[in-house]
């Protein structure tokens, strides 16, 4: 199945349309594939962002993606804190912050040892707002609210340098929730490392590993909540729900969610 792009009177999300045109497609046999695994198009609207937060709350998804990570943070953050802190106050930069819950444990533990300043970073303004609201309620230190909160990895180096000052010399970067798995790992890690100061900054990377069978992993993703979240990308291209079909597979050493387009579609700008 493939997209056909023509002009008519249908209204679509032009950002998604242009991004798909810019990226182009790859071929698998006679099938054209548009890769949007990097998540740039996942949270463009409030509806998309909230649909993801709803998915996070699902029991199976939360257990697989977040519960174990939070348990590990609770167990090891005291030891990590002792290794990380170098005497200065610390900026906690939360990359792909979501609603901020992944940063709660690090903030609570670090704030007992030094002065902390929290800076959420996400491509979704809705996520940033939710993270600022959640972390502000902890009352554990300053929460940075400025234009660079809404950023991708291209701006990370600017953010880290803007936050560094005489009091807050050190940046502690959080990259949790297996967010790194949504990107080409070498490219994204290059951007992260470039934003760090050697000998001063630290990165805490969270990646989900599992010894479950592929069939078990697939089952936890093949849900209505997953479909409700990811289908919003195609619905903004004026597809109807019955014109697309979600599939889940285990390939390239990871779970992949994809959509088959059941018929050609005309698009307009």
Enumerate the language-model features and the residues they cover.
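A short, conserved alpha-helix within the catalytic core of class I
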Residues: 181-194
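Rossmann-like AdoMet
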Residues: 2-93, 100-149, 157, 162-168
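Conserved catalytic-core segments centered on acid/base and nucleophilic motifs
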Residues: 121, 180-181
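SAM-dependent methyltransferase
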Residues: 210-269
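Hydrophobic pocket-lining residues within nucleotide cofactor-binding pockets
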Residues: 153
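Short catalytic/ligand-binding loop motif for oxyanion handling, primarily in non-cytosolic enzymes
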Residues: 101-103, 127, 181-183, 211-215
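Conserved beta-strand signature within the Rossmann-like core of class I S-adenosyl-L-methionine
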Residues: 199-212
């Amino acid at each position: 199945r493939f997209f056909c792009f023509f002009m008519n009177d249908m209204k679509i999300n032009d950002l998604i349309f242009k991004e798909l045109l810019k990226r182009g497609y790859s071929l698998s046999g006679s099938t054209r594939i548009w890769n949007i695994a990097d998540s740039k198009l996942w949270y463009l609207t409030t509806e998309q962002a909230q649909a993801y937060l709803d998915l996070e709350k699902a029991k199976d998804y939360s257990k697989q993606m977040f519960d174990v990570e939070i348990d590990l943070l609770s167990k090891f953050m005291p030891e990590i804190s002792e290794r990380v802190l170098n005497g200065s106050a610390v900026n906690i930069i939360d990359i792909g912050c979501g609603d901020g819950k992944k940063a709660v444990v690090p903030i609570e533990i670090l704030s007992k040892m030094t002065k902390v300043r929290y800076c959420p970073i996400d491509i979704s303004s809705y996520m940033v707002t939710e993270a600022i609201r959640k972390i502000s309620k902890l009352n554990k230190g300053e929460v940075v609210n400025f234009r660079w909160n809404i950023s991708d990895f291209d701006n990370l180096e600017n953010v880290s340098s803007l936050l560094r000052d005489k009091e807050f010399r050190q940046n502690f970067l959080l990259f949790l929730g297996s967010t790194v798995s949504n990107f080409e790992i070498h490219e994204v890690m290059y951007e992260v490392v470039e934003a760090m100061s050697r000998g001063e900054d630290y990165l805490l990377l969270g990646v989900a590993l599992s010894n479950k069978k592929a069939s078990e992993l697939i089952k936890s993703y093949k849900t209505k909540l997953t479909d409700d979240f990811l289908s919003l990308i195609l619905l903004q291209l004026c597809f109807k729900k019955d014109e697309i079909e979600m599939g889940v597979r285990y390939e390239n050493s990871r779970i992949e969610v994809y959509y088959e387009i059941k018929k050609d579609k005309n698009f307009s700008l």
